[in-house]
Amino acid sequence: MANSASGMAVGDECKLKFQELKSKRSFRFITFKIDERTQQVVVDRLGQPGDTYDDFTASMPASECRYAVFDFDFVTDENCQKSKIFFISWSPDTSKVRSKMLYASSKDRFKRELDGIQVELQATDPSEMSMDIVKARAL
């Protein structure tokens, strides 16, 4: 079903790959993009389980918007191993205004399709999704 605000549908592969990340831990991260030709959100890239947060941030385009989910492993102050799934809305300052508006208007609908998101981040610059910020939001 298309999003009434932006007309963007969510591709079935997006939901399927997210379920694989969440339940099987098949991927470390997934990036998604809006395909304006088909008017839907589609999978852009899949990060392998051994990929790092640096691999993830390096995969984000410098001047194009993306949505992403990242399975973040961390150790609490009590020395417990935990994991949280982050939803990241990447809208760099250098991206086109139309693209920023399209991603902003489709975000909430897309996020609702991904059941199991625990933390949300919005970033317009790489510093806004640094490892320090991610760790602070996870704890």
From Swiss-Prot:
The keyword DNA repair does not apply. InterPro entries: ADF-H (IPR002108), ADF-H/Gelsolin-like_dom_sf (IPR029006), ADF/Cofilin (IPR017904). GO terms for molecular function: actin filament binding. It comes from the Eukaryota. SMART domains: ADF. Residues 5-139 form the ADF-H domain. One of its GO terms (cellular component) is cytoplasm. Actin-depolymerizing protein. Severs actin filaments (F-actin) and binds to actin monomers. Belongs to the actin-binding proteins ADF family. This is Actin-depolymerizing factor 6. It comes from Oryza sativa subsp. japonica.
